[in-house]
Amino acid sequence: MEYFDMRKMSVNLWRNAAGETREICTFPPAKRDFYWRASITSIAANGEFSLFPGMERIVTLLEGGEMFLESADRFNHTLKPLQPFSFAADLVVKAKLTAGQMSMDFNIMTRLDVCKAKVRIAERTFTTFGSRGGVVFVINGAWQLGDKLLTTDQGACWFDGRHTLRLLQPQGKLLFSEINWLAGHSPDQVQ
């Protein structure tokens, strides 16, 4: 289990100066050719998403104005707060910020031939489904994960096991992404 606080994470500026990335975790850890990766990005200007051939991307708007996503004849989609949207990461996708507002997004990418991610918003206590990896990010409220208290802009990532996240207040929201491995693949094969 790895815990993080977004406010204390290192920031990588994009080469085109249109945004920045805070990498939460990758699997396998510290590998350039990852099977899955979770990050938080801040987008300050209109532009194109980076291409990642063979990957699926799920983007969830956390803060800021809505973002319009366009991929030639494939799709036109307005990204709204806390509504995950998935697309092939090898498509050219243009992002246009509405009203010029900066946006902050949660991104998870998975290798299409190895694993699949699901992203949900939780508003009550729950137990993960025993996946072989996952990430949680607290949007608001106070949540208990094992012996650790997580509050706004904090989270955790893990590579195996079931975990219970307990909401400690009457209301709260967290983003939860679970990684499931496709038949014939296992995280044990790559470590």
Curated annotation (Swiss-Prot):
It comes from the Bacteria. InterPro entries: RmlC-like_jellyroll (IPR014710), RmlC_Cupin_sf (IPR011051), Uncharacterised_HutD/Ves (IPR010282), Uncharacterised_Ves (IPR023482). CDD domains: cupin_HutD_N. PANTHER family: PROTEIN VES. NCBIfam families: PRK11396.1. Belongs to the Ves family. This is Protein Ves. It comes from Escherichia coli O1:K1 / APEC. The gene is ves.
